[in-house]
Regions:
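A conserved structural/catalytic subdomain of Rossmann-like adenosyl-cofactor enzymes
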Residues: 1-182
Length: 182
């Protein structure tokens, strides 16, 4: 069974993910399914942002391959099944500058290959059913606005880093932190 993992085409170009933790196996499965302009979002425990060993090597490869677009830390108690804070990862197979028609409008994306947007939503949300937190419509609108403004040409006019909320990190900054995304 271990030989099957080594030869699995989903890991093509990456380290073989460890059998002891499926997180990076899932990430590479998702990457293998992305189209040329594909975007994926998925949730993982915050520990996946800074795992060492093989996970670190895979994370470094994902960053060097310009796939990680955004890391969004969500508030605790957002889900019924766990009370821990989790992270929304957004991977994008094409972070290059391009123009795309969406809903009969042209969107002008800037080159973001050497950047990752970090957002921390742990201070957002409102109480829900006594023990849960929900992101309000205003919270969701703010997050999506920041994310989309950051992606666009001319973002200098519409996006700014906000302490404790959002930060656009360069590749060099992430490399300096040892490819840890926390």
């Amino acid at each position: 069974a271990k030989d099957e993992l080594v030869d699995d085409p989903r890991w093509n170009g990456y380290e073989v993910p460890p059998t002891s933790n499926a997180n990076y196996g899932w990430i590479l499965n998702i990457v293998s399914k992305l189209s040329q302009n594909g975007v994926a979002g998925f949730l993982l425990a915050n520990g996946a942002l800074s795992d060492d060993g093989t996970e670190l090597k895979i994370r470094q490869q994902l960053i060097e391959n310009h796939l990680v677009e955004a890391i969004i830390i969500l508030p605790r108690n957002l889900f019924y099944t766990t009370d821990i804070s989790v992270t929304l990862w957004i991977l994008n197979k094409n972070k290059k500058a391009r123009v795309v028609e969406q809903n009969r409008k042209l969107k002008r994306y800037r080159n973001r290959e050497d950047e990752i947007l970090f957002m921390d939503l742990r201070q957002m949300g409102s109480p829900y059913e006594k023990k849960y937190i929900e992101l309000t419509e205003e919270d969701r609108a703010k997050v999506t606005s920041v994310y989309h403004n950051w992606q666009q040409e001319g973002y200098e006019e519409t996006y700014e880093n906000v302490p404790e909320f959002c930060y656009s990190a360069s590749f060099d900054e992430v490399k300096e932190k040892g490819f840890r995304l926390s």
